[in-house]
Amino acid sequence: MTVTGGSSSLVVPMVMWGRHPPVHCISAIYLLRDQKTLVSGSTDGQVFLWEVDATSDKWEMTPRHVLVGHTAPIKCIAKASGGADAHHIVTSSENGEMFCWDTEDGRCIENKKLPGLIHTHIQAYRSPDTQGSGTNSGNTGPSGVKLFCCGFYEEIIAMDPFSLTVIFQLSSRINPDWVASFHVLRPRNRQDDVVLGKSYFLFSYFFRYFILY
């Protein structure tokens, strides 16, 4: 719909919900920390935002937004900002597309396609050193969150969740291979962050430690 007034015009998108819901074959799902918004990605590239009502014994979900932009099935969904009231997410599809969304209004903040970087797992991590300080250290987004990603490549990639740019890469000097899984954590009695990764090599599992300074 286009609203005109004088010499200016405003394009207002409108969505009409029919009697029957659209087909939505879920390929990825994520519940925001406040447990009020559920995000689901589908095999056709659409992302649904659901309003969750957990006041009763049975959780009721009502569709609120349909986010359109991906052209391939969604593989990963992760938060892009920290805190209990965080409302930014990042979605990644199997053709390398990445989108940063605002879940309050459904707005797309940034999108990029990174050829050769097909993510299969994304973990959003905020170092304890930046929590509560309001700082933006390490070239991270406004919340201090980094996205750690692995997939069909030999490294663990750290990305900025809002600009969707690569900050740094972690790779093994010995027998580099696709990383099957990983976890970022701050061990007890340590002042640095550690990435524990597991890769496939000759059908065996190798655990590798990467220390983040």
Which ranges hold each PLM region?
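Terminal intrinsically disordered, low-complexity extensions flanking WD-repeat/beta-propeller proteins
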Residues: V3, G116-T120, T130-T135, Y153-E155, ...
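Short C-terminal beta-strands that terminate individual repeats in beta-propeller domains
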Residues: V15-P21, E60-G69, C108-L114, F168-R173
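Structural hallmark of WD40 beta-propellers
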Residues: Q35-V39, A84-V90, F99, C108-E110, ...
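Conserved strand-to-loop turn within each blade of WD40 beta-propeller repeats
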Residues: G41-D44, S92-N95, C150-Y153, K198-Y200
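WD40-repeat beta-propellers
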Residues: V47-E51, M98-D102, I157-D160, L202-R208, ...
